[in-house]
Amino acid sequence: MGKPLLQIALDAQYLETALVDVKQIEHNIDIIEVGTILACSEGMRAVRILRALYPNQILVCDLKTTDAGATLAKMAFEAGADWLTVSAAAHPATKAACQKVAEEFNKIQPNLGVPKEIQIELYGNWNFDEVKNWLQLGIKQAIYHRSRDAELSGLSWSNQDIENIEKLDSLGIELSITGGITPDDLHLFKNTKNLKAFIAGRALVGKSGREIAEQLKQKIGQFWI
């Protein structure tokens, strides 16, 4: 794979706030995520408006889908999302339904610049056998989260985190990594071959958002040539 991409998670409750947040760093990011809170508050309107405003960036709808997979996937993709998140806790049938919808969209529109894809959110209980099953379904992407408690406690990425990421990488799944990512963290993942993106939310909003985005891009350029 090429260089990892940089993704902003828009976790504001209101679209007006999210639009201000993304505007200040629009030239430094590759992926825009309609976060779960924003999607619940504003619905697919947020996806449609961001798609219209940013046609050249990858757009993620972070629904953390756990049920009604086919319906939610269709809603997100029709609104303009490129990727849809599905919870690792979702029933296998839900994951399969979401993947089927993505494949149907790609078949109907074979020349899409960014194919529709499913991302599995690695929250809660999951195991590597399940990851193999997802790959067999055709799902290529997953999102690895550092422990929320560890993040809030100011703890760094653990050896277990790195081991998990290395094993996921060896299976061939494309990983996005999140959980309080800072520029100083990026060197920990420089040997990850299938690294899709780094995701940051709070770090990229506010007065220092643009500066942090530039630092993250600089580190990506340093470690991935």
Swiss-Prot record:
One of its GO terms (molecular function) is orotidine-5'-phosphate decarboxylase activity. Pfam families: OMPdecase. Gene3D superfamilies: Aldolase class I. It comes from the Bacteria. Substrate binds at D11, R202. Mg(2+) binds at E33, D62. Belongs to the HPS/KGPDC family. KGPDC subfamily. Homodimer. This is Probable 3-keto-L-gulonate-6-phosphate decarboxylase. The lineage of its organism: Bacteria, Pseudomonadati, Pseudomonadota, Gammaproteobacteria, Pasteurellales.
